[in-house]
């Protein structure tokens, strides 16, 4: 049984999602080019070699992409624990179709759609940077 927190939740919201990547600049360019992200100038900790960018979107959502050169990059199975995809709303079926076609033409693998799912969502899903899935929806 779910119980409600005794704390009011009107001020709670998702602030950001962080994603480690091997190629920070390629990841940054992907989100800027295809999904309209605005990037900060980046952060670099010279002692640890950690680098990151915060990518901001018009609705206030933020994605932090991060890199540590020595971090291993294990194979990413589609059926695994952890996040399944990051979804981006583009506003219309036509825009889902157009962005999916553009990504496919640019060499990204489309793994589903564009289609209407069993629960009524119009979407497509692509394998974007480094095996991570991006869902494009209305």
What are these regions (language model features)?
Residues 2-4, 40-41, 50, 70-75, ...:
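A short, acidic/glycine-rich surface segment
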Residues 1-10, 54-56, 100-138:
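Vicinal oxygen chelate
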Residues 94-99:
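Short amphipathic alpha-helices within nucleic acid-binding modules
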Residues 76-79, 84:
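Helix-adjacent hinge/juxtasegments
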Residues 58-62, 71, 93:
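Short, charged/polar surface micro-motifs in flexible loops or helix N-caps
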Residues 1-26, 83-88:
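N-terminal beta-strand motif that seeds the catalytic metal site of vicinal oxygen chelate
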Residues 49, 82, 120:
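Exposed loop/turn and edge beta-strand positions of beta-sandwich/beta-sheet ligand-binding modules
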Residues 11, 20-62:
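Core segments of cupin and vicinal oxygen chelate
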């Amino acid at each position: 049984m779910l119980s409600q927190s005794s704390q009011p939740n009107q001020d709670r919201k998702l602030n950001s999602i962080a994603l480690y990547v091997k190629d920070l600049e390629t990841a940054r360019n992907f989100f800027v080019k295809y999904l309209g992200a605005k990037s900060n100038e980046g952060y670099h900790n010279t002692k640890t070699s950690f680098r990151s960018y915060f990518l901001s979107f018009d609705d206030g959502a933020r994605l932090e992409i991060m890199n540590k050169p020595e971090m291993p990059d294990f194979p990413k199975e589609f059926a695994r624990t952890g996040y399944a995809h990051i979804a981006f709303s583009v506003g219309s079926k036509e825009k889902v179709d157009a962005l999916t076609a553009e990504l496919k033409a640019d060499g990204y693998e489309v793994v589903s759609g564009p289609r209407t799912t069993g629960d009524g969502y119009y979407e497509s899903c692509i394998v974007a940077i480094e095996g991570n899935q991006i869902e494009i929806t209305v």
